[in-house]
A protein has these predicted regions:
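Carbohydrate transferase catalytic cores enriched for Leloir-type hexosyltransferases
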Residues: 1-392
Length: 392
């Protein structure tokens, strides 16, 4: 059987890119010579990166025919009568693909009329927190709903990264529970490339950061809660005369200017450092020099940075409503309360508290690894079942 992995993210998307790359490498390992695995990407710059990782790669582009098939998707009987296939599906069929694996949610799944597919759901936060502009504005909510309602019922398998997310998928979209597999993510495999003394020295030379800062690697979206962290720093400075430094690393999706304005308004110019998007090789050094990873984000139920922090022995400050992800491996706070976050920041300065959280992080990472390996056994079995049915 030949499986196609569809990878349409570029490196600037951050966590989504790393999760997708992990998923591709995982699938290749699970195929283990039994099945052939080929990656298809719309981003030409991904080709050398994927090839260097040992993956077979094909580059494709979206065509006007794909758009026409998508628009006609509301009239499936007409499509059947016209016998129109998208250029996307034609390319896959031309490569003798048997099964398509979407490592990210994708409208392209709705273009497939003959080929079966595995679909990945990263989150359902447009339903959990519809009040944020990145979900509410410009039709983002409607677009996500359209994709999920059209693609999920026809998927031979749906991958979610937690049992919490699996339950929400089943409840909200009416798919059968046995067709949804909860399989935890793993830390970015690219993180290891910067976990060495040479990378540490290079990163320090580039960024010139103080020791013991609070680290928040996140794109600048409203739901990421950067401003809540600034408010907490103001409270700490007011109550104890000083506050720790904070380092933001991530690309801008429209909210950075507001965060920068708040830094000036709060008088935190000397305490907050904006690094922008940083290369993968600098992430581990930035984690290693941090006092803690702080994530005042609303979206979940899981996130990638906690896995990275646990793998590098960095303590985690995490929202209470995401406790299902981190278990005992975080110090929690109310994401709607600057006072609560300030209290957590104050507590994490205690070495005993830090060591407790770090030790729990090691345990949590092992627990998630065991869950992932169990899910991989199920996934391999599902691939074998599909292969047997597909060849009939």
């Amino acid at each position: 059987m030949i499986i196609a992995g569809i990878f349409t993210q570029d490196v600037s998307t951050g966590g989504g890119y790393h999760q997708g790359l992990n998923a591709l490498l995982q699938m290749q390992a699970l195929c283990n010579g039994k099945h052939e695995f080929i990656v298809f990407t719309t981003v030409p710059a991904n080709e050398p990166i994927l090839a260097q990782a040992g993956l077979k790669v094909r580059v494709f582009r979206t065509t006007l025919r794909d758009l026409a098939v998508f628009l006609l998707g509301s009239f499936p009987l007409l499509l059947m009568r016209l016998r129109w296939l998208s250029s996307f599906e034609k390319k896959l069929l031309g490569e003798n693909i048997d099964l398509v694996y979407f490592v990210h949610p994708s409208l392209r799944a709705t273009l497939l009329q003959r080929l079966n597919y595995i679909f990945t759901v990263m989150d359902l936060c447009h339903r959990d927190f519809p009040e944020f502009p990145e979900v509410r504005n410009t039709g983002a909510f409607e677009c996500r709903e359209q994709v999920y309602r059209a693609a999920l019922p026809k998927a031979v398998l749906i991958l979610a990264d937690s049992s919490e997310l699996k339950e929400r998928i089943v409840r909200r979209y009416g798919v059968e529970a046995e067709r949804v597999l909860a399989m935890p993510f793993q830390p970015s495999l690219l993180l290891k490339s910067g976990d060495n003394e040479a990378a540490m020295a290079e990163a320090q030379s580039v960024y010139q950061l103080p020791e013991g800062y609070l680290f928040y690697p996140a794109q600048f979206w409203s739901h990421k809660g950067h401003i809540r962290l600034l408010e907490a720093l103001v409270l700490l400075r007011r109550n104890q005369g000083d506050c720790p430094s904070c380092v933001f690393a991530g690309g801008d999706h429209g909210n950075r200017r507001l965060v920068e304005q708040k830094v000036v308004e709060f008088g935190l110019q000397g305490r907050v450092h904006f690094l922008g998007f940083v290369p993968s090789g600098h992430l581990a050094p930035l984690y290693r020099r941090a006092q803690a990873l702080v994530m005042p984000t609303y979206f979940g139920p899981t996130n990638l940075p906690p896995l990275e922090a646990w793998s590098l022995d960095v303590p985690l400050l995490y929202p209470e409503h995401l406790r299902g992800h981190a278990g005992d491996a975080a110090l929690y706070f109310d994401v709607d309360s600057a006072e609560s976050l300030a209290g957590a920041i104050k507590k994490i300065a205690d070495p005993i508290c830090r060591e407790r959280i770090v030790a729990a992080g090691r345990v949590r990472l092992k627990e998630l690894s065991a869950e992932r390996m169990s899910a991989e056994v199920v996934l391999v079995r599902q691939l074998d079942v599909f292969c047997g049915r597909h060849m009939m």
